[in-house]
């Protein structure tokens, strides 16, 4: 495990190029660069970006082998992500790479594969207020945050969110229209850690908000490989101790 946490910020990067003025105005360099620019300023991070339209979606085996934590944003082109790249990411997560899944990436191939469920939910896009409550203040992802924070205008996601029960639940969101949502969920998969974080939308400046960026930073620090012992599976012909009772 590297002393520096190597982060790859992945973005579909379609809305900012093709969806008219609003996404381009809000994120002229793409959402991935809004996130990466912040992470590059934080201590202990080495940051690169990758996007869908790059060869191999920017996620060659070499890139993934040199990634401690991968962040993922996608929405309109989930089906364009090649299955072999998804399998490549999946194996790296099981081997210990952290994965941060954001907003509409709940429908991404990699998240659905890791969850084993539909990952479906309710939604509404009218620009309403979201209030995120920290419900586990002892969790590392909540470090440095207030008891709650608000996003002035966002897309609503509502329960039921069809996911396995999280190993750890850090945030719950309330929306101005009345819905609630499990908006900060953690799982362990193999040797890797997965964090789903709800906020983030292509037409709202959410990835410039300090609390949101702090959560992403904390999520990366939590999800990075821990440096624990490697585990081995399969037949073990040589016992650790002498066996005297075998036939």
Positions of PLM-derived features:
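A glycine-rich, often tryptophan-bearing local segment used as a flexible ligand/cofactor-contacting loop or short
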Residues: 77-145
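Short beta-strand segments enriched in small/hydrophobic residues
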Residues: 2-21
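Extracellular ligand-binding/catalytic regions of CAZymes and related secreted enzymes
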Residues: 2-4, 125, 189-247
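Helical hinge/lid and interdomain linker segments adjacent to catalytic or ligand-binding clefts
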Residues: 24-108
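Short, solvent-exposed loop/turn segments at secondary-structure boundaries
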Residues: 20-26, 207-210
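Catalytic beta-strand/loop cores that center a nucleophilic Ser/Cys/Thr
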Residues: 46-48, 65, 121-198, 233-235, ...
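Cell-envelope and extracellular/periplasmic
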Residues: 12, 73-75, 200, 224
């Amino acid at each position: 495990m590297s002393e520096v946490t190597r982060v790859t910020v992945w973005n579909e990067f379609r809305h900012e190029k093709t969806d008219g003025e609003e996404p381009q105005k809000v994120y002229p360099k793409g959402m991935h660069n809004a996130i990466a620019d912040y992470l590059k300023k934080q201590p202990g991070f080495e940051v690169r970006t990758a996007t869908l339209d790059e060869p191999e979606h920017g996620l060659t085996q070499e890139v993934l082998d040199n990634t401690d934590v991968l962040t993922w944003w996608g929405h309109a082109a989930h089906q364009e992500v090649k299955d072999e790249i998804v399998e490549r990411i999946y194996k790296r997560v099981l081997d210990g790479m952290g994965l941060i899944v954001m907003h509409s990436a709940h429908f991404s191939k990699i998240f659905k594969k890791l969850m084993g469920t539909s990952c479906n939910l309710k939604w509404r896009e009218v620009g309403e207020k979201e209030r995120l409550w920290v419900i586990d203040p002892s969790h590392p992802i909540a470090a440095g945050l207030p008891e709650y924070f608000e996003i002035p205008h966002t897309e609503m996601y509502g329960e039921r969110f069809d996911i396995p029960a999280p190993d750890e639940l850090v945030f719950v969101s309330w929306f101005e229209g009345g819905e609630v949502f499990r908006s900060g969920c953690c799982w362990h998969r193999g040797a890797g850690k997965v964090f789903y974080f709800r906020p983030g939308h292509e037409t709202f400046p959410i990835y410039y908000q300090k609390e949101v960026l702090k959560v992403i930073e904390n999520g990366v620090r939590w999800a990075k490989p821990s440096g624990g012992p490697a585990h081995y599976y399969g037949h073990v012909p040589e016992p650790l101790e002498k066996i005297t009772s075998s036939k």
